[in-house]
């Protein structure tokens, strides 16, 4: 695993998944949904861009955190309202496939600050979704 100044074990405990560490110490988590995802009738692996992604970029004692939440329609309003109430910037809401089941929608969200406090906020968002974490 590449090096990062972030405590990956502490972040993993909060997020509930094992991270990868990429270039410049960016720590990334992929959090799959509980329900199987089908694309064109074929069950696909969550790592094929159908998992919520959480990335922490170290910035000294702070981090920039970007989350790409994967949601079904019934989860959108509650998740976005929660994250906005905690000061997250909602970058967009979109869908990328037309033939997946269940139909997924995505929302990029961003905030900078203490990485572990932000991880706790992300956890609150993840808890609103039907995820496997």
Residue ranges, per PLM feature:
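Long, contiguous binding/interaction regions
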Residues: 1-104, 110-133
């Amino acid at each position: 695993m590449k090096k990062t100044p972030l405590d990956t074990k502490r972040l993993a405990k909060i997020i509930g998944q094992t991270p990868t560490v990429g270039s410049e110490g960016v720590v990334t988590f992929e959090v799959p949904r509980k329900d199987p995802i089908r694309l064109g009738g074929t069950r696909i692996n969550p790592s094929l861009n159908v998992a919520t992604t959480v990335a922490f970029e170290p910035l000294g004692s702070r981090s920039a955190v970007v989350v790409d939440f994967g949601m079904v329609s019934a989860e959108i309003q509650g998740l976005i309202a929660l994250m906005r109430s905690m000061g997250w910037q909602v970058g967009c809401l979109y869908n990328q496939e037309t033939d997946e089941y269940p139909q997924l929608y995505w929302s990029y969200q961003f905030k900078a600050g203490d990485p572990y406090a932000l991880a706790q906020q992300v956890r609150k968002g993840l808890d609103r979704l039907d995820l496997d974490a």
